[in-house]
Structure formats: structure tokens, C-alpha cells
């Protein structure tokens, strides 16, 4: 039967990609439906109970800057906050929050249920309806049909998911949840390129059976960071420590003696796992020279006895998992509450997607999250937001929007996926970004909030707060530029006490702040430069902009050079077979990838600068040479 209402956007899946994908078009004013197999697991943290980290924290800030939910939920649920790389430069500093699973899920569900234009319905989707290569709706397990102008698929690990514990395996989307088998079969019929990936999770341990007294304690930061630009430290719940233990030679011996029972080492698992989050059996075999690996014991919540042992993800049999756990210091008498497991699942080649995350072959069908070959809550959330935005724009028949590589880590992520594809679970790192000095956590709002306002993603309160911050930054920079200190000043002696070398020529406040020994706090403690500004976010921007001005200007010059042809559009109907001078190999790769811009084409492996020049000449000849935004 047909459901009576027609939607603008339907989102399948209520994980980290799905929740952002549903909220974005709803905030833009589009009637949106979120289909989930279980409303009680919306925003579920299926693996590590943490948000953020190197590169990942940048994505969280970007999602927040565009009105997304993840940062707000992390602030509400974070039970230990840390700033990683705090002693390094601002480009690589990253926020991480250990999270209470229950509080996080509650924050997500509350936001979804209170969002206008958004309906939530509990049903497993089994079919995507398509007419003349255009999506028209979704069918569910109980025979309901929902009509929609666009559909976003965010199925995570559920598509033909198979769970492995030892040599035993069974269908499942994650522990306790069934797999989406029918939907997987339907998607395979669409002709999209599909393959298998694998991820895993460690056993959960009963905290009451751990001897914490003999373990090293890890506290969070004393000055607590905040994820959301609209957040406050007052949003954070009680803060608690994590603990550290280590594997040892006994642990490694248990693992080596049981590799014949490992689904990874006996060929049962065919999917490729995440390079940067390997299983403990992988670590022991790949790093055979190491006799110890550090394991973080992370609490799963303020009211839970479960502990997440970060670093021993495994698919070995349960008795072997017990041997691994009990071999470590402090865990000699520990009990496992939930066994660890590996899961294989379908993912689709992201090279079959436009940078908007719409499929190239089916209009109005978008993919986001792990089904695009990524790993991590943060990568999923960023994709969900982008897909949600473009699903809304598609409904309005407006121009699509997606960020450039020099604009955000989301832009880096999507460009890497859609241009290069991936054969293993992809995660974001700061090292993947060419212009990371410009793509910092602290300036995500400056980069993206004006765009979010233009797209209708943020409310007036956020916009007003952002504009006030920008005004504070400009006023303070003007103030520091206008106050000069000269060698005959009555304040010279006071200044020389904090300067590394005495002042010998006239200098403005900006000039003094550029000195390596000077900070904003020290500068504004000097009489001429009092008082300090109260807006700490604005202070941070002022200090970074002044101290790193030369480096920032250099990167901006590099970007302008790159932009010259980066955004030159290649029409979807461009016929490479009629371009003389291209080798058969280059022509085949271009036909396969169908890049949407010269910049994207240039990053395809094997596409030479000479080939790019030939394409540009032909675009010009055919009157197709149009610059993108």
C-alpha cells in the first residue's frame, strides 16, 4: 500500500550519517522522512564511545559550523575531553571527547524528535523505487510504499552484513541487529560497483572485575574544550578518567597459538579492514618485534559498568578473547560482558558518485557514510550533512553545492572518495589536506557558517553570534594596529621585561604579537594594550591570524594558482572518444571516472598534465570552457 504523504527527502538509516542527512533538509524546509529499523538505536555508537580525534575533530567542527548535530551531542555526552596535539601548531590540534553512549543517543533522539519538517518511522527499507533512472520512493518490509523526490541511503554496515566470532558467522548489521539482505540484493541489481569491507570491535569488559588500583590513570584536560561553536562547558556532564594497561608476551602467545581459529587468517573473511584501526591479531603479526601494545580502558558511560578496551578489536573465538583479556595487568580476573567480533558488509565504489554524493546513474539517489567506503562516525556525519543539503537542492532544482579541498576537510574527504575511490576503509587525517593551515578546527565557522546561512541551514541566533564574533575579531585587530609603542615611550621598560629582545624601533600591537615570545595574554597585560577582549574564540582568531599571517598568505596564493583550472567544469556529456591526442589508457580512465571538473580529472591516477592540457584545448574549441564558482 502507498503511504498517504509524499516526501521531499527520505533517509534510510538512523546512524551518524542518517541523522545528519535527515536534519539538514528538514532545517532547509523540506518535508523529510527518516526510516530506521529501530528508533531506540538512533545515533547509536556501535563501536568506540568517542567523538573526534586527529582530523576527525575537524570534521565535527565543520558539521557544527553548518548547523549539524554531532558537536552538540558530543558536548552533552562527553565524559572526558582532551585537546590532542595541544603543544603543536593550530592546524593539527584536535578535540576528542570520550562519550556516554546513553547520553549521546538521548541528545540525538531529542534533536530529531524536535526538528520541524522531520518524521521518523520504524521500518526496514527493502526496495528503492526507480522510474526512468530517477528515484521515486522506498518500499518497506511490511509492504508500505513511501513516495519521495530524493532518497539518501545511509545503511552503515547493515547491507548484507555478516558477523564473525571465530570460525562461526551469521547475518547481522551489528551485534543484536539483523542485516539488510533484501535491500542489498536490490542495490546490486542497479549495476553499481559493489565490494566488501570489514571492520571490528573489541569485547566489552565488566568494570567491577577490573583492578583499577594498579593501572595508570588518564585524566582529561583541566580546561575543558567545547565542540560546538554554540556550546558551553556547562553542557558537559560529570568528567571521569580512563585507564591504561598493556598487552604482553603472554597475550601475544595466546593470539599466535590460535591463528588457525581466526576468520581473518583462515580466509573466511574476505573484506579488507581499516588500516589505522587494526585488530589485535593483526598488530601482533604485523609488528612482531614489539612485545607490548598500549590499551586504553574507556568507560562507556556514567551509569554503565561496561568498559571499552581500545586497542584489542578482535574476531577470535570467545575463549581466546578471555585469554587475551585475562593476560593483561589489572584484567587478570576481568569478565567479558559482550564478545568482540568482526563484521563484513557491502560498500559501493564512491567513484560512481558525484561530489554531491548523488549517484551518477540514478537521479535523486544519494549515498552517505560507510557504504561509501569510509570508517568513523565523523566521516559518516560529514557525508550525511552534504548528502542532505544536496538532496534538498535537488528537490528545488537548484545548483548543487559541495566544498572544495581548500575549503574544508569534508571537501578533502569527498574529493578523495569520488576521484580516487578506496579499497580499504577510508579515514580522515590532517596529512590528507594540502592546505591544512587554513583548515583548522578553530576557524571552521569562518569557513562554512556563511555558506550554511545562505543555504538555510542555521537559525538566526547562530548567525547573530557568528557575526558578533567576526565584528569582535575585526575591532580587536584594528585596535592592536592603532596602538604603537616607540623606544621613547613611558611604557618601554614595562614592555622590555617581557620582550625577548629590547624594542629599538616603533612597533604596533600586531608587530609585537608576531614575536615568538609574545602571546595575546602577555600583550594585553601591558598598560598600553589593556584591556584584553573577553571573547576567547575571537582572541584565538586574532592571535593565529597575526602570528601565522605570512604562512596563511602563502597558502592562499597557492590556492589561487590551483584554482585557475580547478573548478573548470567538464560537461557530463563530454565525449572523450572524439578528443585526439589522448592515449587509450587515459581515455578509458576518464570514461570510467567521468570527472566533473579539471581539478578532479587531474587527481585521477595516470592522468598526465599533458592530457589535462588536451582536454582544456578541446573544451575551448567546443565552447564548453566555463569556470565553476
UniProtKB/Swiss-Prot annotation:
Task of the protein: NAD-binding protein involved in the addition of a carboxymethylaminomethyl (cmnm) group at the wobble position (U34) of certain tRNAs, forming tRNA-cmnm(5)s(2)U34.
A Pfam short name: SAM_GIDA_C
Essential cofactor(s): FAD
Binding site for NAD(+): 273-287
Entry GO CC: cytosol
Swiss-Prot/TrEMBL keywords: Cytoplasm, FAD, Flavoprotein, NAD, tRNA processing
Superkingdom of origin organism: Bacteria
Gene3D superfamilies: FAD/NAD(P)-binding domain, GidA associated domain, C-terminal subdomain, tRNA uridine 5-carboxymethylaminomethyl modification enzyme MnmG/GidA
Name under which the protein is recorded: tRNA uridine 5-carboxymethylaminomethyl modification enzyme MnmG
SMART domains for the chain: GIDA_assoc_3
GO molecular function, one term: flavin adenine dinucleotide binding
Amino acid at each position: 500500500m502507498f503511504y498517504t504523504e509524499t516526501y521531499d527527502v527520505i533517509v534510510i538509516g538512523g546512524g551518524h550519517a542518517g541523522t545528519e542527512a535527515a536534519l539538514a533538509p528538514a532545517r532547509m524546509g523540506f518535508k523529510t522522512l527518516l526510516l530506521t529499523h529501530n528508533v531506540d538505536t538512533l545515533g547509536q555508537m556501535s563501536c568506540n564511545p568517542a567523538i573526534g580525534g586527529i582530523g576527525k575533530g575537524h570534521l565535527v567542527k565543520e558539521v557544527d559550523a553548518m548547523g549539524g548535530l554531532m558537536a552538540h551531542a558530543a558536548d552533552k555526552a562527553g565524559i572526558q575531553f582532551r585537546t590532542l596535539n595541544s603543544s603543536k601548531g593550530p592546524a593539527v590540534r584536535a578535540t576528542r571527547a570520550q562519550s556516554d553512549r546513553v547520553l549521546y543517543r538521548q541528545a540525538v533522539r531529542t534533536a530529531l524528535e524536535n526538528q520541524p519538517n522531520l518524521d521518523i518511522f520504524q521500518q526496514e527499507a527493502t526496495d528503492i523505487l526507480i522510474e526512468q533512472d530517477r528515484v521515486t520512493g522506498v518500499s518497506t518490509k511490511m509492504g508500505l510504499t513511501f513516495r519521495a523526490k530524493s532518497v539518501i541511503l545511509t545503511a552503515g554496515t547493515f547491507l548484507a552484513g555478516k558477523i564473525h566470532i571465530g570460525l562461526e558467522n551469521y547475518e547481522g548489521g551489528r551485534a543484536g541487529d539483523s542485516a539488510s539482505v533484501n535491500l542489498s540484493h536490490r542495490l546490486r541489481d542497479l549495476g553499481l560497483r559493489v565490494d566488501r569491507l570489514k571492520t571490528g570491535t573489541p569485547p566489552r569488559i565488566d568494570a567491577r572485575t577490573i583492578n583499577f588500583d594498579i593501572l595508570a590513570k588518564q585524566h582529561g584536560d583541566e580546561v575543558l574544550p567545547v565542540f560546538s561553536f554554540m556550546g558551553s562547558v556547562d553542557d558537559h556532564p560529570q568528567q571521569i578518567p580512563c585507564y591504561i594497561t598493556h598487552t604482553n608476551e603472554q597475550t601475544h602467545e595466546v593470539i599466535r597459538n590460535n591463528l588457525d581459529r581466526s576468520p581473518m587468517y583462515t580466509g573466511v573473511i574476505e573484506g579488507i579492514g581499516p588500516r589505522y584501526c587494526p585488530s589485535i591479531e593483526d598488530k601482533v603479526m604485523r609488528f612482531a618485534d614489539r612485545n607490548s601494545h598500549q590499551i586504553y580502558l574507556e568507560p562507556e558511560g556514567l551509569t554503565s559498568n561496561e568498559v571499552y578496551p581500545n586497542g584489542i578489536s578482535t574476531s577470535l573465538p570467545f575463549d581466546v578473547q578471555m585469554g587475551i583479556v585475562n593476560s593483561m595487568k589489572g584484567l587478570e580476573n576481568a569478565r567479558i560482558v559482550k564478545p568482540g567480533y568482526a563484521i563484513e558488509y557491502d560498500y559501493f565504489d564512491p567513484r560512481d558518485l558525484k561530489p554531491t554524493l548523488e549517484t551518477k546513474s540514478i537521479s535523486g539517489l544519494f549515498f552517505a557514510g560507510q557504504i561509501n567506503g569510509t570508517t568513523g562516525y565523523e566521516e559518516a556525519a560529514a557525508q550525511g550533512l552534504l548528502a542532505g543539503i544536496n538532496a534538498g537542492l535537488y528537490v528545488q532544482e537548484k545548483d548543487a553545492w559541495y566544498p572544495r579541498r581548500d575549503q574544508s576537510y569534508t571537501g578533502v574527504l569527498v574529493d578523495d572518495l569520488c576521484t580516487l575511490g578506496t579499497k580499504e576503509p577510508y579515514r580522515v587525517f590532517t596529512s590528507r589536506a594540502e592546505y591544512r593551515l587554513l583548515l583548522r578546527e578553530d576557524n571552521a565557522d569562518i569557513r562554512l557558517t556563511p555558506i550554511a546561512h545562505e543555504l538555510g541551514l542555521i537559525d538566526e541566533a547562530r548567525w547573530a553570534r557568528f557575526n558578533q564574533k567576526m565584528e569582535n575579531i575585526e575591532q580587536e585587530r584594528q585596535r592592536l594596529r592603532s596602538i604603537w609603542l616607540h623606544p621613547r615611550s613611558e611604557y618601554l621598560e614595562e614592555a622590555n621585561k617581557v620582550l625577548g629582545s629590547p624594542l629599538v624601533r616603533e612597533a604596533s600591537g600586531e608587530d609585537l604579537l608576531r614575536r615568538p615570545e609574545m602571546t595575546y595574554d602577555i600583550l594585553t597585560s601591558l598598560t598600553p594594550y589593556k584591556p584584553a577582549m573577553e571573547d576567547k574564540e575571537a582572541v584565538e582568531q586574532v592571535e593565529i591570524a597575526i602570528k601565522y599571517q605570512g604562512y596563511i598568505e602563502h597558502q592562499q596564493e597557492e590556492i589561487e594558482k590551483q584554482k585557475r583550472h580547478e573548478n573548470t567544469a567538464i560537461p557530463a556529456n563530454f565525449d572523450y572518444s572524439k578528443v585526439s591526442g589522448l592515449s587509450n589508457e587515459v581515455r578509458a580512465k576518464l570514461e570510467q571516472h567521468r570527472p566533473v571538473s579539471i581539478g578532479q580529472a587531474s587527481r585521477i591516477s595516470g592522468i598526465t598534465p599533458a592530457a589535462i592540457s588536451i582536454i582544456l584545448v578541446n573544451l575551448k574549441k567546443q565552447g564548453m570552457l566555463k569556470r565553476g564558482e
